[in-house]
Design a protein with these regions (language model features):
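Catalytic palm subdomain of template-directed nucleic-acid polymerases
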Residues: 53-70, 141-164
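Short, surface-exposed helix-loop/turn micro-motifs enriched in polar/charged residues
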Residues: 9, 43-46, 132-133, 151-154
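Conserved pre-catalytic core of RNA-dependent polymerases
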Residues: 1-108
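Hydrophobic alpha-helical membrane-association signature
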Residues: 30, 117-121, 155-162
Length: 164
């Protein structure tokens, strides 16, 4: 993550797998915002999401392009592409192994690189959204001060974009 930290690449409200950040810091910042809004007499609507199988759904092709966009090029990007490509998987049931099939998406969980690769992949999640988005890896809190029906529609549009 030193490249991401050195060049200040990662989304500032991403609290996962980062120095001095945690699930607790995500929650503290969120709660602080909501309490401030309550003190100011403002309504805050909140949506809390967890994207199922998020690590498994990472497109290798898109991840490589995103890393290149963030300045990871040349040998390192080639090495990471090699790390992800050529993987296969099978299922074993009662001692019988299925046919091995290629794995074209996902980052290897339990690997040292998996979390960093995932953070690069999800880094642009809040682009084009009007709500505040706070992340702990893929655990997402989206919220917005609601002053009118238009604000509620804005939050709904952001939810629709996040669901894509």
């Amino acid at each position: 993550m030193s490249h991401a930290d050195k060049y200040n690449i990662l989304y500032p409200f991403q609290h996962g797998f980062r120095k001095f950040s945690s699930c607790e810091t995500q929650h503290i910042e969120f709660i602080d915002d909501v309490i401030q809004n309550l003190d100011d007499g403002k309504q805050t609507d909140v949506i809390i999401m967890d994207f199922p199988k998020a690590f498994d759904k990472v497109s290798h092709y898109l991840l490589m392009h995103k890393q290149e966009h963030y300045g990871i090029r040349g040998m390192i990007n080639n090495w990471m592409e090699s790390f992800l490509s050529g993987r296969t998987q099978a299922v074993i049931v009662e001692g019988e192994t299925s046919t091995y099939l290629p794995v074209d998406s996902g980052v290897p969980q339990g690997s040292a690189l998996g979390p960093s690769l995932f953070l690069y992949y999800i880094n642009d999640i809040a682009t084009g959204l009007d709500s505040t988005i706070r992340l702990f890896v893929d655990d997402t809190i989206a919220y917005l001060v609601i002053k009118s029906n238009n604000d509620a529609l804005t939050l709904q549009r952001d939810l629709d974009k996040l669901a894509q």
